[in-house]
């Protein structure tokens, strides 16, 4: 929003727009004009947006499945999304991972910072080959029990779908 609004009406419009952006961020939607959030091309934003809920769900599941204590998390984006910036997907995974483990409200803007402060490192990989899927989002890491865990998902008719749990392929 333009911060130099010179009329009362313009100031109200700027305040409303800024407030709506804050609400969007707090609700987990991507920031449109944030200074401290990655700037995405409209094409990337359109491509990535449908996968943000999937990434967050995978992160939430992974936090429980790995029994916490994850220090290094690998995010692999395969298929059609591999050509796009995966930073928002990474943020959504971290938002899910930290959702129940943080006293702070975790959103797409602060998720990476909160993860870093907890000693969590994210390794990102992109590959054009998603096997039988057009796009596959996979996260893996070592939990507190020392076991390496892997979960993967995709979208089926626009809905998040779990398709892999460790070495098992499934359709949930």
Residue spans of the language-model regions?
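NAD(P)-dependent dehydrogenase/reductase Rossmann-like domain
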Residues: 3-172
């Amino acid at each position: 929003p333009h911060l130099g609004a010179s009329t009362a009406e313009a100031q109200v419009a700027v305040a409303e727009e800024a407030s709506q952006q804050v609400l969007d961020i707090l609700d987990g939607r991507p920031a449109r004009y944030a200074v401290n959030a990655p700037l995405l091309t409209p094409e990337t934003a359109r491509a990535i947006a449908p996968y943000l809920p999937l990434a967050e769900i995978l992160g939430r599941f992974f936090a429980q499945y790995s029994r916490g204590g994850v220090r290094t998390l690998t995010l692999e984006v395969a298929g059609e999304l591999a050509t796009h910036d995966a930073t928002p997907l990474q943020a959504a995974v971290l938002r899910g991972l930290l959702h129940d483990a943080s006293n702070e409200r975790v959103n797409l803007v602060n998720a990476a910072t909160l993860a870093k402060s907890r000693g969590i490192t994210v390794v990102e990989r992109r590959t054009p080959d998603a096997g039988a899927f057009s796009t596959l989002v996979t996260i893996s890491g070592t939990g507190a029990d020392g076991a390496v865990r892997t979960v993967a998902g995709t979208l089926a008719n626009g809905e998040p779908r779990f398709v892999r749990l460790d070495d098992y392929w499934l359709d949930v």
